[in-house]
């Protein structure tokens, strides 16, 4: 796969990956407003949940217990609040379908097609983190469960993560 760097019309850097993937490092609201209606078949997003993660004091150590978190104050308060309604309006306008991770944190329409990511945390790890994550989808399908161990330092098959 060939990659190329280029400047966008927003004077931000983007990465082009063949055949048709472009990664943009810009404010998403600036970009969304440049898109036409239904430009994308699918939008997969993981917006800020509004839980203030930068202020949480603990994370998980290698043995599954809690460890003092590093100082992340330099990343700012990006996760202090959920996106404004304008974001949701633009996201729905520019994409035919959506998968929204953390959908349980947001005021979204009713959907049957949720995805449950079972992080396989099990009691043996003795941690206080969630057992899984929810993704809201626009698809009219039954709920689906995806099982993959991911709990801080405990992660399934990280030996060959590039090959996944």
Regions found by a protein language model. Name each.
Residues 4, 83-84, 153, 164:
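General structural signal for secondary-structure boundaries
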Residues 1-42:
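SAM-dependent nucleic-acid methyltransferase catalytic core
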Residues 34-45, 49, 53-73, 92-164:
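Class I S-adenosyl-L-methionine
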Residues 77-86, 117-121:
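Short acidic (Asp/Glu) patches
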């Amino acid at each position: 796969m060939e990659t190329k760097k280029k400047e966008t019309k927003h004077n931000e850097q983007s990465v082009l990956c063949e055949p048709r993937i472009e990664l943009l490092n810009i404010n998403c609201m600036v970009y969304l407003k440049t898109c036409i209606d239904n430009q994308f078949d699918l939008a997969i997003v993981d917006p800020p949940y509004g839980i203030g993660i930068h202020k949480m004091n603990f994370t998980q150590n290698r043995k599954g217990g809690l460890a003092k978190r590093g100082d992340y104050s330099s990343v700012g308060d990006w996760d202090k609040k959920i996106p404004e309604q304008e974001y949701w309006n633009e996201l729905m306008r520019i994409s035919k379908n959506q998968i929204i991770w953390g959908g349980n944190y947001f005021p979204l329409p009713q959907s049957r097609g949720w995805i449950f990511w079972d992080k396989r945390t099990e009691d043996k790890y003795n941690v206080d983190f969630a057992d899984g994550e929810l993704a809201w989808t626009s698809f009219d399908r039954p709920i689906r469960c995806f099982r993959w161990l991911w709990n801080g330092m405990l992660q399934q098959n990280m030996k060959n993560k590039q090959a996944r």
